[in-house]
Amino acid sequence: MPAGEGIGDSHELLEFLCDKLPVLDKLCRFKVANTIKCNSCEYSDTKMDSMIEFSIAPRTKKQSVSETIVDAATPFVLGDWTCEKCKNKGCTKQFLVGTFPQLLVFHMTTVNTSVSYTPILVLNGLKYALFAVVCFNGGHWWTYGRDLPPGNDWFTFDDKNVQSHGPQQFPLTENMRLLMYSRLNE
């Protein structure tokens, strides 16, 4: 099978590339934890994992990327969960990010919703600059991209064309599927 055959979307392509290119995987991979804590006896269970992208599903139109991260990390109650230790029902679950990667990729998981995003993103005191926006509409893919540091021109990469834009022509689009940020070394 040819490399990349059977890849259906940008998320699958990123997974494929990280699997084949360890250097890319190392740049994108970050550590996370899911913690469940019993609301009765305070027993807790934490599962460590790692990811190559942060999936976002905005709950409201034009919710910001930062707000979706806060939502994902906000503890929430699971009423039907049964504690292993005390057998009571009810727990609090929380998603935590342990480390942030050099390349931070956000994957839009919902269709027909949009998220607001900015050219600079600050998370946990780390500053990231947007360098690529992968878009999809009606079976057609295209990408906005630029060289870093910020201030360089944006380009549109389409099936047949590459179009140059000025550095101020920021690629705002409701067709975004991936946002790619690079950590700035300041």
Where are these regions (language model features)?
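Exposed substrate/partner-binding surface patches
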Residues: 43-186
